């Protein structure tokens, strides 16, 4: 299959997407590292990042914000990628499921309850206090989903997750940067978190690293991959999901994971995908928001946001399922225009 704005890695083979054989699963939660100033733009302020996953879940589940008056935005007023993802879900009719990955505030929409607590700041404390419980939640959801869908697209909403991914990768000897929701990556802040984390406790095994330095998403994904054997897992996200794929390979011994992301992430951190051996197992959505009517969406082209809430994976899903670029862009623009009224 040749689609000019979707690049499918040569190690993936044929992909068949339809709303009958695919489900989108959003794992959403918080990590206290997002409260550090300058770490993430996934919220108008560090404190607001506590509620970003909550409102992202509400946008995916209900099509509107219920816990706040406005959607999560960067400090510059650029909207959450949940806007893009929900618009594509509406356009394609794809089913979705929201998972509690450690909400600070539970959303006002239906979700798969895990009773997982928010992840902690690894520079101050063990990041995942009940790792086995988180992993078991992943295993249980995997057993429910496996075999019922040909494709399971997994998205995330974890503000600060590229920082925890950076720390875990560094602990495993991978000296490469992770992406960011900001045009200029806060590399020095990420390095500071890593140094503080390693001073607190120094571990080297992949599972210990994810527990000490990571977040619930990483542990949950390891558990999920343990149970999902018949369905194809498509990790919809950027360097957070690249890190998850690496952990799954090291802990579960599986190297069949597909990572689907945007060209904004891939062009920013292609070295990490190469180092992790993911270039041939990646789907890259070459998205261009330059024609959008809304300025906040056009600014995605300037390196803001880049990825999140499965945006890149859902774009590639829609294109492979037969929707045109113009249909997708119009749906996104129309949804956001209506959303702002």
Curated annotation (Swiss-Prot):
Q: What's an example of a GO molecular-function annotation for this chain?
A: nicotinate-nucleotide-dimethylbenzimidazole phosphoribosyltransferase activity
What stretches pass through the bilayer? none
**Entry superkingdom:** Archaea
Q: Which CDD domains does the record associate with it?
A: DMB-PRT_CobT
Q: Which PANTHER family match?
A: PTHR38811, UPF0284 PROTEIN SLL1500
Q: Name the family.
A: Belongs to the UPF0284 family.
State the protein's name.
Answer: UPF0284 protein Ta0078
Species in which this protein is naturally found: Thermoplasma acidophilum (strain ATCC 25905 / DSM 1728 / JCM 9062 / NBRC 15155 / AMRC-C165)
């Amino acid at each position: 299959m040749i689609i000019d704005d979707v690049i499918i890695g040569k190690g993936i083979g044929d992909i068949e997407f339809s709303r009958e054989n695919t489900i989108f699963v959003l794992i959403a939660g918080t990590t206290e590292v997002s409260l550090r100033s300058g770490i993430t733009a996934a919220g108008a302020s560090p404190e607001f990042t506590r509620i970003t996953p909550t409102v992202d879940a509400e946008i995916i589940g209900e099509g509107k914000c219920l816990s706040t008056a406005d959607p999560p935005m960067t400090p510059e007023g650029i909207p959450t990628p949940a806007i893009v993802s929900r618009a594509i879900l509406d356009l394609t009719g794809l089913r979705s499921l929201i998972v509690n990955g450690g909400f600070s505030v539970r959303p006002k929409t239906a979700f798969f309850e895990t009773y997982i607590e928010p992840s902690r700041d690894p520079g101050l404390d063990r990041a995942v206090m009940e790792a086995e419980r988180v992993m078991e939640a992943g295993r249980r959801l995997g057993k429910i989903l496996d075999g019922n869908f040909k494709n399971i697209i997994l998205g995330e909403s974890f503000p600060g997750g590229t920082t925890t991914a950076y720390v875990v990768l560094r602990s495993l000897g991978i000296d490469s940067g992770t992406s960011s929701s900001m045009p200029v990556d806060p590399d020095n802040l990420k390095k500071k978190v890593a140094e503080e984390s390693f001073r607190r406790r120094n571990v080297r095994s992949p599972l210990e690293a994810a527990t000490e330095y990571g977040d619930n998403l990483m542990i949950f994904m390891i558990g999920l991959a343990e149970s999902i054997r018949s369905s194809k897992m498509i990790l919809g996200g950027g360097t957070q999901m690249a890190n998850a794929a690496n952990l799954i390979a090291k802990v579960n011994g599986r190297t069949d994971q597909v990572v689907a992301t945007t060209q904004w992430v891939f062009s920013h951190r292609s070295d990490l995908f190469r180092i992790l051996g993911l270039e041939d197992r990646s789907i890259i959505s070459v998205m261009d928001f330059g024609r959008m009517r809304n300025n906040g969406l056009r600014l995605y082209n300037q390196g803001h946001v880049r990825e999140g809430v499965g945006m890149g994976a859902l774009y590639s899903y829609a294109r492979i399922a037969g929707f045109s670029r113009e249909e997708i862009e119009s749906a996104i623009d129309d949804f956001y225009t209506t959303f702002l009224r």
